[in-house]
Amino acid sequence: MSKEKTPRSLGDNEAKAVARMLRVSPQKLNLVAQLIRGKKVDKALADLEFSRKRIAYDVKKTLESAIANAENNHSLDVDDLIVAEAFVGKAMVMKRFSPRARGRSGRIEKPFAHLTIVVREVTAVAAGA
C-alpha cells in the first residue's frame, strides 16, 4: 500500500515556489523579501528588476516560478495575483578558516538561506472591500 497523499496546505486560490540553499545570509535576503511582500506581482517584478541587491535576481526567478505555477498548475489569472507571503528561513552555515598572523586562524562563516514565495489570486470585489 502506498502512503496517503497529504492534503494541500495552500488554498485553492494560491500557489507557491521555493528556492533552497541560496548563498546569502537570511538577513540580507529578508531585506529583498520585504520589498515585494503584499504587492501585485507585476509591481513586485518591476521592483526586483531595478533593485541593486545581488540576490534580487534569485528572488525574481522564484517569483516568476510561483507565477508560472499559479498559471499552469492551478489555472489562476496572472493579472489578479498578489504576493501573499514571502518568507525566509535559515539553512546551513559553511565554516571556513582563514590564516591569520602568528600561526593563528580566523573563522569565516558562509551562511545559506531558503526563500518561499506564496502568490494569491484576489478578485476585484475582494480587493475593493
Curated annotation (Swiss-Prot):
* A Pfam short name: Ribosomal_L22
- SUPFAM superfamilies recorded: Ribosomal protein L22
Name under which the protein is recorded: Large ribosomal subunit protein uL22
- Say if the entry is tagged with keyword Electron transport: no
Q: Explain the purpose of this protein.
A: This protein binds specifically to 23S rRNA; its binding is stimulated by other ribosomal proteins, e.g. L4, L17, and L20. It is important during the early stages of 50S assembly. It makes multiple contacts with different domains of the 23S rRNA in the assembled 50S subunit and ribosome.
Lineage, highest ranks first: Bacteria, Pseudomonadati, Pseudomonadota, Alphaproteobacteria, Hyphomicrobiales
Q: Which GO terms describe its cellular component?
A: cytosolic large ribosomal subunit
- Coding gene? rplV
User: Any idea which UniProt keywords this protein has?
Assistant: Ribonucleoprotein, Ribosomal protein, RNA-binding, rRNA-binding
Give the UniProt family note.
Answer: Belongs to the universal ribosomal protein uL22 family.
- InterPro entries, per this entry? Ribosomal_uL22 (IPR001063), Ribosomal_uL22_bac/chlpt-type (IPR005727), Ribosomal_uL22_bac/org-type (IPR047867), Ribosomal_uL22_CS (IPR018260), Ribosomal_uL22_sf (IPR036394)
Gene Ontology biological-process annotations: translation
| The protein's assembly and partners | Part of the 50S ribosomal subunit.
Entries under PANTHER family matching the protein: CHLOROPLAST 50S RIBOSOMAL PROTEIN L22-RELATED, LARGE RIBOSOMAL SUBUNIT PROTEIN UL22M
An annotated Gene Ontology molecular function: rRNA binding
